[in-house]
Amino acid sequence: MLFEFARWLQQFESLFGLFNYLTFRSILAALTALFLSLWIGPVLIQKLSQFKGGQPIRQDGPKMHFSKAGTPTMGGSLILMTVTLSVLLWGDLRNRYVWLVLVVMLAFGAIGWYDDWIKLARRDPNGLKSRWKYLLQSIFGLAAGLFLYFTADVPAAVTFYIPMFKSIALPLTSISFVAITYFWIVGFSNAVNLTDGLDGLAIMPTVLVACALGVFAYASGNTLFSSYLKIPTIPGAGDLIIICAAIAGAGLGFLWFNAYPAMVFMGDIGALALGAVLGTIAVIVRQELVLVVMGGVFVIETLSVIIQVTSFKLTGKRVFRMAPIHHHFELKGWPEPRVIVRFWIISVVLVLVGLATLKVR
């Protein structure tokens, strides 16, 4: 909105030409989301704390988590609100990718909200039944894949690329493209949700990955940079840096309240939405495999659950003391802050490795 207004004002004052620069608007988007989060956060947390007694705690979870009972949840709604407002203010609302990512974020956020609502209303930490959750996620994930495939305006937008082997380009059929899009959106949506089990554990890796995806989006949308770096040129993808910046700002603002000991939990409303956004942006800029690397913390958490369940079903034995794996380290005696910070460090390293693929040929 403000971007369009600034474009109109440019005819009277050349200074408003600054708003044509994605880098300038991305900074404004990040700051807007950050300050909105810090401003709205205390009020929202106060309202959430009055609702249904706070987050139900799993009885089979680590005993140290029982002290968290009553902590308000659904704090992810703060992230969704501030990201949406910031993008509407500073994003190019003529860009179809901007609208797609916003719709995906709000759709998965709605699924998460319903899941959180059931947990609170029924005092059941399991929430919405898995089959219904996956069904709803699948509908939106498949819809996003179909939209991206049938609106693609360049061959690169529907081609699969392998990092570090930039001469390898695999054209995708409609079925394979939609399938990949589905698995990345739904997969990362649930992966971030599984990671969100400790104070601040999921949000910092999300911020880091969002920042890195913003770099990829900016480069992919710029013909000069994409040609030099030998990455696919996707017209219009550059505007996704606004969303990535808004997520970074909103995420840091949320972390102010979610840092150990948390004043509020993100809840499924935030985790499902943010994971879906990361998956969607990675698909748009054709960096699916890079996301697997940069989002390695999310991948490891998910694999730990898969390994644990598979091992128990086949052998009756558990590989980890508890899954996801962050609980395993808790039960080994690691203090919660140590687990969190070490996972953050791993995330920083993996994001740097992902960014390095921009230059590795």
Swiss-Prot record:
<feature type="transmembrane region" description="Helical">
    <location>
        <begin position="237"/>
        <end position="257"/>
    </location>
</feature>
<feature type="transmembrane region" description="Helical">
    <location>
        <begin position="289"/>
        <end position="309"/>
    </location>
</feature>
<dbReference type="GO" id="GO:0071555">
    <property type="term" value="P:cell wall organization"/>
</dbReference>
<keyword id="KW-0812">Transmembrane</keyword>
<dbReference type="GO" id="GO:0008963">
    <property type="term" value="F:phospho-N-acetylmuramoyl-pentapeptide-transferase activity"/>
</dbReference>
<dbReference type="InterPro" id="IPR003524">
    <property type="entry name" value="PNAcMuramoyl-5peptid_Trfase"/>
</dbReference>
<dbReference type="GO" id="GO:0051301">
    <property type="term" value="P:cell division"/>
</dbReference>
<keyword id="KW-1133">Transmembrane helix</keyword>
<dbReference type="InterPro" id="IPR018480">
    <property type="entry name" value="PNAcMuramoyl-5peptid_Trfase_CS"/>
</dbReference>
<feature type="transmembrane region" description="Helical">
    <location>
        <begin position="98"/>
        <end position="118"/>
    </location>
</feature>
<dbReference type="GO" id="GO:0046872">
    <property type="term" value="F:metal ion binding"/>
</dbReference>
<keyword id="KW-1003">Cell membrane</keyword>
<feature type="transmembrane region" description="Helical">
    <location>
        <begin position="26"/>
        <end position="46"/>
    </location>
</feature>
<keyword id="KW-0479">Metal-binding</keyword>
<keyword id="KW-0132">Cell division</keyword>
<keyword id="KW-0472">Membrane</keyword>
<dbReference type="GO" id="GO:0008360">
    <property type="term" value="P:regulation of cell shape"/>
</dbReference>
<feature type="transmembrane region" description="Helical">
    <location>
        <begin position="139"/>
        <end position="159"/>
    </location>
</feature>
<keyword id="KW-0808">Transferase</keyword>
<keyword id="KW-0131">Cell cycle</keyword>
<dbReference type="Pfam" id="PF00953">
    <property type="entry name" value="Glycos_transf_4"/>
</dbReference>
<keyword id="KW-0573">Peptidoglycan synthesis</keyword>
<feature type="transmembrane region" description="Helical">
    <location>
        <begin position="200"/>
        <end position="220"/>
    </location>
</feature>
<feature type="transmembrane region" description="Helical">
    <location>
        <begin position="264"/>
        <end position="284"/>
    </location>
</feature>
<dbReference type="GO" id="GO:0009252">
    <property type="term" value="P:peptidoglycan biosynthetic process"/>
</dbReference>
<feature type="transmembrane region" description="Helical">
    <location>
        <begin position="339"/>
        <end position="359"/>
    </location>
</feature>
<protein>
    <recommendedName>
        <fullName>Phospho-N-acetylmuramoyl-pentapeptide-transferase</fullName>
        <ecNumber>2.7.8.13</ecNumber>
    </recommendedName>
</protein>
<dbReference type="GO" id="GO:0005886">
    <property type="term" value="C:plasma membrane"/>
</dbReference>
<dbReference type="InterPro" id="IPR000715">
    <property type="entry name" value="Glycosyl_transferase_4"/>
</dbReference>
<keyword id="KW-0997">Cell inner membrane</keyword>
<keyword id="KW-0460">Magnesium</keyword>
<comment type="function">
    <text>Catalyzes the initial step of the lipid cycle reactions in the biosynthesis of the cell wall peptidoglycan: transfers peptidoglycan precursor phospho-MurNAc-pentapeptide from UDP-MurNAc-pentapeptide onto the lipid carrier undecaprenyl phosphate, yielding undecaprenyl-pyrophosphoryl-MurNAc-pentapeptide, known as lipid I.</text>
</comment>
<keyword id="KW-0961">Cell wall biogenesis/degradation</keyword>
<comment type="similarity">
    <text>Belongs to the glycosyltransferase 4 family. MraY subfamily.</text>
</comment>
<dbReference type="GO" id="GO:0051992">
    <property type="term" value="F:UDP-N-acetylmuramoyl-L-alanyl-D-glutamyl-meso-2,6-diaminopimelyl-D-alanyl-D-alanine:undecaprenyl-phosphate transferase activity"/>
</dbReference>
<feature type="transmembrane region" description="Helical">
    <location>
        <begin position="73"/>
        <end position="93"/>
    </location>
</feature>
<keyword id="KW-0133">Cell shape</keyword>
<feature type="transmembrane region" description="Helical">
    <location>
        <begin position="168"/>
        <end position="188"/>
    </location>
</feature>
<comment type="pathway">
    <text>Cell wall biogenesis; peptidoglycan biosynthesis.</text>
</comment>
